[in-house]
Amino acid sequence: MLDKPCGSAACPQCFRLHRLRKLAELAPLRGCMSAYRVVTLVYYDAMLEEEQISCWDHKKFRERVYKMVKRAGFTDKIVGGYELDFHTDIQRWMPHLHLLMPREPGALKTLRKAMKRDKNIRARAGIISRPMKSQKLRDFDAQVTYCFKGMWQEVRPYPDEVGKRRTRKHRLPPVLLARALCKQDEMGFTGLTFTSGVRTRK
């Protein structure tokens, strides 16, 4: 590791420091873990073709997510990270977020309803889409750092022993990895972090 960090969001060492910094910032929440959920939001209707990642308007997408969260009625802080995984079966990048969200039942229900609108649910023909996943916060360190893991991956589908569709994640191939790292470097740590109800760290 270099004596002086380069500060790039495409650098594994610098991203690790970013994750540790976020973990330290959120440490006060350890005492109220039951008041939070770890939520994944998948925006199927915002899929990108392979070459579109370089011109993806992440600021416009962030504003969309921010407005959706605000309309849901959350009152406490929300923080997490953006990711784009490449799905081999449809040859598309899939924007999604892993978020630490307050356990506010009414707001979570409203958000789930918004995420399950037809436009998002029916974006992939013949595939059952699950746009929102909510989990209890049980392992603080592991789940919080997962929200800022910063490793975009390739997702490959496969049938299980009863023929049900499953997926497995793999390292991106060289060309896609290069595109992903260039985008992460462009976005920076601030651009890769979603916040609502909390001051953004520059």
Where are these regions (language model features)?
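Right-hand nucleic-acid polymerase module
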Residues: 1-93, 103-202
